[in-house]
C-alpha cells in the first residue's frame, strides 16, 4: 500500500494516522473504566468515584468520536486529491490509447482511480490504521497479567494466519475477476454501440447468447471467490469469539486462584475484542484491499502515464510535411501494414491517397496526424517529428475528418469549436467553408441544436458536413480527410469540392483518402497504395 504515502497524500495520511493514534488512546478508556469499576467502585461503594469515572469515560468517547470524524475527513480529502491528480491524466491516457491503438480498455485506468478513491472511503482503510495498535493492546493486556498476554498473543497469531491464508487464496482470483468483469462490461458496451447492426441483421439472440456465456463465466468466478471470502470471514469471526472466550476463561482461572481481580478479567476481554476487531475487518474486506492494490499496480504499469510532450514550444506550423521511410504495424510478429512509405508535400499542396481496401490508406492518414507511432522512419511537420509537438498546442493547427464521425453531447456550435470557447465568427466561418451553414440553420435550434447520444438524430450527409466544419475550424494548416465524400449526395459532393478549393486558397496542406475520380481531380498529387507500399505518386 505504498500509494498511501505518495507525496500528494502524505499530509492527509499523516493527519489520519495522528487521529487514529488519539482515537485508539481514547478507546482504551472503556477497558480502564471496567477495571476501575470492578476493583475500586465495588470495593469502596463510592458514588462519587463512579460518577467521576463515568464522566471521564464519556469525555474520552466524545473525543474519540471527534478523532474518528477527523480521520474520515482526512481520508476523504486524500481521495479527492487522488481523483484530482490522477483522473485527468488517466482519462488523457485512455484517449491516447484509443486514438493510437484503437483499444477501448484505456478507460479502465479511470476506473482504477475511482477504485482507489472508493477504498479511501471504506472500512478497510480504517482497519489498516487501527491494525498497528494490536501489539500495543497486547502489551497492555500482558501488563495486566502475563498469562492473559500470552493467550491474547496466540489468538492474534491465529487471526494473522487466517489473514495470510486470505491473501494467498484470493489474490490471483481477485485480479482475474476484475479483468473478467471489465471484459464483460466492454462486451455489453460494444453490443449497445452496434445495436443498429445487431437488430437490423436479426443477430440480437446470438449476440445475447455470446454475452450470456461470458457473463455466466464471470458469475461462476465471482461465486467461487465470494464463497472463499465468506468462509474466511466467518472463520475470522468465530476465531475472534473463541480467543475472547479463551482470555475470559484464563482470566477466570486466575481470579479463582487469586492471581488476578475480576476487573482485570473483564477489562482484558474487552480490550482484546477491540484489538482484534480491525484484523477481523481486514479479513472480511480483503477483496477491497486487493482491488485497491491491483488498481495502483495497473496505474503504475509502463504506458499507463500519458506520453510527455515536448517542453520547448515550437512555432505555429506552416504545413510542410515529410514522410520518410515509414514502417508501421501493430504486432511486431506480423507483417507490417506500411512498408517504407516516403513522400513530401510543400505547404499548401494537396495529396489524394487511393488504393484497395486494406492497402493502408487510413493507417497512413492516422500516422500523419501522430495518432500512430511508426516502427521506423518518421513523419515530420515543418521538419519536426510529429511526436515532438505538444498535442495541445498542435491540435488547433490540425483538421481531421475520420471515417466514423462522432459528436459530443454538446451543441452544434460547441462541437464545431471542438468543445473550446465558442467564437461565433470562427464557428460560422468554418461552417460556411464546409458548406454546412445552411444545413445547420435548418436544424430545430440551429447552432444551438444538441448533438451526441442525447441530441438530435442527423442524416449521414448532415453528420459529414458538420464534421467537416469541425475539421476546418480555426484555419488549420494540415487537414486530413478520410473518405469525406461518404454519405454525401451530389449537392454535398459539390460543397466538398468547393471546400477543398477554399482550403487550397488558404494555404492549407490537405490529404484526402478517397476513391472517386471527381474528388481526386481537385488535388495536386495522387499517391497509390497497395499492400502497404507506395506504388506510384504523381500529378493528379
Regions found by a protein language model. Name each.
Residues 1-29, 43, 47-53, 71, ...:
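Membrane-integrated ABC transporters
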Residues 20, 57-60, 126-176, 249-260, ...:
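Transmembrane helices of ABC transporter permease
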Residues 56-68, 155-158, 233-243, 262-284:
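Hydrophobic alpha-helical segments in the permease module
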Residues 413-453, 497-498, 502:
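ABC ATPase nucleotide-binding domain helical subdomain, centered on the C-loop/LSGGQ "ABC signature"
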Amino acid at each position: 500500500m505504498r500509494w498511501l504515502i505518495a507525496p500528494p497524500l502524505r499530509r492527509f495520511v499523516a493527519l489520519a494516522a495522528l487521529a487514529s493514534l488519539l482515537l485508539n488512546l481514547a478507546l482504551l478508556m472503556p477497558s480502564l473504566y471496567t477495571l476501575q469499576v470492578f476493583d475500586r467502585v465495588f470495593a469502596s461503594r463510592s458514588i462519587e468515584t463512579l460518577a467521576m469515572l463515568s464522566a471521564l469515560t464519556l469525555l474520552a468517547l466524545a473525543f474519540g468520536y471527534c478523532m474518528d470524524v477527523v480521520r474520515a475527513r482526512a481520508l476523504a480529502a486524500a481521495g479527492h486529491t487522488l481523483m484530482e491528480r490522477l483522473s485527468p491524466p488517466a482519462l488523457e491516457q485512455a484517449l491516447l490509447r484509443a486514438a493510437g491503438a484503437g483499444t477501448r480498455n484505456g478507460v479502465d485506468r479511470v476506473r482504477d482511480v475511482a477504485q482507489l478513491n472508493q477504498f479511501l472511503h471504506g472500512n478497510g482503510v480504517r482497519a489498516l490504521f487501527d491494525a498497528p495498535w494490536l501489539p500495543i493492546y497486547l502489551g497492555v493486556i500482558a501488563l495486566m497479567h502475563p498469562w492473559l498476554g500470552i493467550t491474547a498473543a496466540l489468538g492474534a497469531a491465529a487471526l494473522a494466519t487466517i489473514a495470510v491464508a486470505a491473501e494467498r487464496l484470493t489474490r490471483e482470483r481477485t485480479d482475474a475477476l476484475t479483468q473478467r468483469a471489465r471484459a464483460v462490461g466492454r462486451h455489453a458496451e460494444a453490443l449497445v454501440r452496434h445495436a443498429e447492426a445487431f437488430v437490423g441483421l436479426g443477430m440480437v439472440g446470438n449476440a445475447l447468447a455470446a454475452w450470456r456465456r461470458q457473463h455466466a463465466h464471470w458469475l461462476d468466478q465471482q461465486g467461487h471467490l465470494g464463497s472463499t471470502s465468506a468462509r474466511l470471514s466467518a472463520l475470522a469471526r468465530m476465531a475472534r469469539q473463541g480467543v475472547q472466550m479463551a482470555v475470559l476463561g484464563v482470566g477466570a482461572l486466575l481470579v479463582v486462584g487469586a492471581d488476578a481481580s475480576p476487573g482485570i478479567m473483564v477489562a482484558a476481554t474487552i480490550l482484546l475484542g477491540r484489538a482484534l476487531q480491525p484484523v477481523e475487518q481486514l479479513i472480511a474486506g480483503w477483496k477491497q484491499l486487493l482491488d485497491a492494490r491491483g488498481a495502483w499496480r495497473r496505474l503504475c504499469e509502463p504506458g499507463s502515464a500519458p506520453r510527455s510532450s515536448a517542453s520547448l514550444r515550437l512555432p505555429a506550423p506552416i504545413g510542410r510535411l515529410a514522410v520518410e521511410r515509414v514502417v508501421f504495424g501493430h504486432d511486431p510478429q506480423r507483417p507490417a501494414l506500411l512498408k517504407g512509405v516516403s513522400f513530401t508535400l510543400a505547404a499548401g499542396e494537396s495529396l489524394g491517397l487511393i488504393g484497395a481496401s486494406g492497402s493502408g490508406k487510413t493507417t497512413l492518414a492516422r500516422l500523419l496526424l501522430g495518432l500512430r507511432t511508426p516502427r521506423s522512419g518518421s513523419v515530420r511537420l515543418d521538419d519536426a517529428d510529429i511526436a515532438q509537438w505538444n498535442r495541445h498546442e498542435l491540435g488547433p493547427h490540425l483538421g481531421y475528418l475520420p471515417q466514423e464521425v462522432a459528436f459530443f453531447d454538446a451543441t452544434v456550435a460547441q462541437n464545431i469549436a471542438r468543445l473550446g470557447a465558442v467564437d461565433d465568427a470562427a464557428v460560422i466561418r468554418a461552417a460556411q467553408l464546409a458548406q454546412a451553414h445552411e444545413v445547420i440553420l435548418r436544424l430545430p435550434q440551429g447552432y444551438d441544436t444538441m448533438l451526441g447520444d442525447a441530441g438530435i438524430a442527423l442524416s449521414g450527409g448532415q453528420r459529414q458536413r458538420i464534421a467537416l466544419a469541425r475539421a476546418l475550424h480555426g484555419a488549420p494548416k494540415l487537414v486530413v480527410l478520410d473518405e469525406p465524400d461518404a454519405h454525401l449526395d451530389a449537392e454535398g459532393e459539390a460543397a466538398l469540392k468547393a471546400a477543398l478549393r477554399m482550403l487550397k486558397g488558404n494555404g492549407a496542406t490537405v490529404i484526402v483518402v478517397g476513391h472517386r475520380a471527381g474528388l481526386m481531380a481537385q488535388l495536386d498529387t495522387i499517391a497509390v497504395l497497395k499492400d502497404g507500399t507506395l506504388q506510384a505518386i504523381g500529378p493528379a
